[in-house]
Amino acid sequence: IVNDAYFGAVPDDRLLTQDNTLFFKGDGQYRSKIGLTPKRATPVIGSYDPSRNLLTVVHYTLPDGITDYVNSMWELQDAPYAGDVLNSYNDGPPDATTPPLGPFYELETSSPAAALSPNASITHVHRTFHFEGSSNDLNAIAQTVLGVDLPTIQSVFNTSALGSESE
């Protein structure tokens, strides 16, 4: 479902799928990166920072039927056009002795890979919207645009929310 091999597998307490929604913990405390192919991605992603009452929504161009995207894994490529359209990077210390670059996290999108003739072009649009407001107003936006409510976003990585399947 998700490519989490960029910096090694992402632990379960930082990456979770629930009801067709992928949750990735972007707190700048653990170096990791995930990606989605165009077959699995949607044209909208988001993040929520409850400490600042800030909802970030990214809407981007995701052309139908296009599957060739540059493979950005840091290795020699067997399939250089089998890449991800959507990535999220979470900064953090790479090891116990090296400080992080930030800390920060990113929501990234890519245009399709295209062998363009001279003077030819393609267009890729990436729009980032930052919404600040009351929890009720932001919750309405999150439900409408992301299909998930803020209480779910806030609770998904709580220890109690990661119980066994029988709970």
Show where each model-derived region lies.
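Short, hydrophobic/aromatic-enriched beta-strand segments in well-ordered soluble domains
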Residues: 120-133
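Extended, histidine- and acidic-residue-enriched regions that form the cofactor-binding/catalytic faces
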Residues: 136
